[in-house]
């Protein structure tokens, strides 16, 4: 006997919220889709450029310059990326270097602060 949609719905209804989140993530990975809801935009008046731009949610943390204390910058890059000593040294000396891609705003700000405390110059893109 085949499993019906109703059987699946009942099984999901009995799951905890964490289990449902894990299930959604697994489905996204398996089928290569995103569970983000599609939002329809209402047509507004045809005017000049949009005044309130959508706030960016993902940032790339880019090391622009290591600064005067390369050793501290290398340590900070190693801590942030998990790179080995040679790879981190090459990254710091070969700036610009993308330390982290698609980081959340909070994570990007924290990483930027950590790298700047080590004397590096960092940009969020």
UniProtKB/Swiss-Prot annotation:
Signal peptide: none annotated. GO terms for biological process: translation. Transmembrane segments: none annotated. InterPro entries: Ribosomal_bL12, Ribosomal_bL12_C, Ribosomal_bL12_C/ClpS-like, Ribosomal_bL12_oligo, Ribosomal_bL12_oligo_N_sf. One of its GO terms (molecular function) is structural constituent of ribosome. It comes from the Bacteria. Keywords: Ribonucleoprotein, Ribosomal protein. GO terms for cellular component: cytosolic large ribosomal subunit. CDD domains: Ribosomal_L7_L12. Homodimer. Part of the ribosomal stalk of the 50S ribosomal subunit. Forms a multimeric L10(L12)X complex, where L10 forms an elongated spine to which 2 to 4 L12 dimers bind in a sequential fashion. Binds GTP-bound translation factors. Belongs to the bacterial ribosomal protein bL12 family. PANTHER family: 39S RIBOSOMAL PROTEIN L12, LARGE RIBOSOMAL SUBUNIT PROTEIN BL12M. Forms part of the ribosomal stalk which helps the ribosome interact with GTP-bound translation factors. Is thus essential for accurate translation. This is Large ribosomal subunit protein bL12. It comes from Francisella tularensis subsp. holarctica (strain LVS). The gene is rplL.
């Amino acid at each position: 006997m085949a499993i019906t949609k109703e059987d699946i719905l009942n099984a999901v209804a009995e799951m905890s919220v964490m289990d449902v989140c894990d299930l959604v993530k697994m489905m996204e990975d398996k089928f290569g889709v995103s569970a983000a809801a599609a939002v329809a935009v209402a047509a507004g008046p045809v005017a000049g450029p949009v005044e309130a731009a959508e706030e960016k949610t993902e940032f790339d943390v880019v090391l622009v310059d290591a600064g005067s204390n390369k050793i501290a910058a290398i340590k900070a890059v190693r801590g942030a990326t998990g790179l080995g000593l040679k790879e981190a040294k090459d990254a710091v000396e070969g700036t610009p270097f993308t330390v982290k891609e698609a980081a959340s705003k909070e994570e990007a700000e924290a990483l930027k602060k950590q790298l700047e405390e080590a004397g590096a110059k960092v940009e969020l893109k």
